[in-house]
Amino acid sequence: QVPKAVMEAVKKKFPDATAESASKGVEDGQPFFDVQVKLKARNAWVTCDPQGHILSVDREISFQELPKAVAGAISKKYPKAAIRGVNEIVEGPETVYDLALTFNGKKLIAIFEANGKFVEESADDEP
């Protein structure tokens, strides 16, 4: 059962969204709740503590919504890459952008800070 405070926090953050699913987890001994919402045909995942404090928001965005510094850094590091998906992840004061892309025939996940600084790259095992 998802606490009322969690659902209220999600509704306040995304008033026009529809809750799709919710799950409970524990990290470092602390319980949390993940709520997936659908917002204008895109998904977002909101992670809250049991009191309804939002810990992080991970939402799908379009490439055009990326900050110019990030879009420029991607074009420079991965010229002619096919972008398969973009997520904006906000955790406290930090915002990073997680991109699923195909570059030189390889499926990759690349993460950039909001200022365009490259963070890391890993193989994308998703089909």
Residue ranges and their predicted role:
Residues 1-127:
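Interaction-mediating elements
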